Amino acid sequence: MAGKKTKSGMISHGMAAQNRKGRFDYTILETTEAGIVLKGPEVKSLRLGRATITEAYAAERDGEIWLFNSYIPEYQGGVLSRFEPRAPRKLLMHRKQIAHFLGAVSRAGASLVPLDIHFNARGMAKVTLGLGQGRRKEDKRHAIAERDWKRDKARLVRSSGKDY
């Protein structure tokens, strides 16, 4: 779901990109919100809602958390502002948060999974990171069956309330 759009078609606040596959492939144990360092045209491109984070991952580099392999396409409106669409982008977190998440990654063998990129109420770009434990194939099947059952149950409840 995209966030609220202005006249120009840009997202002012709300969801810019979502990693639905991340929630399916990983059991999310804990989430946090982190700021992201972006250049001007990257923000404009992100506001158009054209970013992809399906293949993205977060990892440690020099004691900081970075977002790798996220795709933010070049903004077509700018002429002089070129940037690398898949460049690593620094995530802004407190030192204690970084230590907590890196400790969990090294101890439990978990992964830092970017779940979405959104704009908060102040218009700042944020990344929701999840500490995820990888799911096995049978766990994925169980998740699919559970999701289907919830959908069918909701459908039955809706249809049982109708008068014939």
Curated annotation (Swiss-Prot):
The keyword Cell cycle does not apply. Its main location: cytoplasm. GO terms for molecular function: RNA binding. PROSITE patterns: SSRP. One of its GO terms (cellular component) is cytosol. Keywords: Cytoplasm, RNA-binding. Gene3D superfamilies: 2.40.280.10. The keyword Cytoplasm applies. It is found in: Cytoplasm. One of its GO terms (biological process) is trans-translation. InterPro entries: SmpB, SsrA-bd_prot, SsrA-bd_prot_CS. HAMAP family: SmpB (MF_00023). Belongs to the SmpB family. Required for rescue of stalled ribosomes mediated by trans-translation. Binds to transfer-messenger RNA (tmRNA), required for stable association of tmRNA with ribosomes. tmRNA and SmpB together mimic tRNA shape, replacing the anticodon stem-loop with SmpB. tmRNA is encoded by the ssrA gene; the 2 termini fold to resemble tRNA(Ala) and it encodes a 'tag peptide', a short internal open reading frame. During trans-translation Ala-aminoacylated tmRNA acts like a tRNA, entering the A-site of stalled ribosomes, displacing the stalled mRNA. This is SsrA-binding protein. The lineage of its organism: Bacteria, Pseudomonadati, Pseudomonadota, Alphaproteobacteria, Acetobacterales.
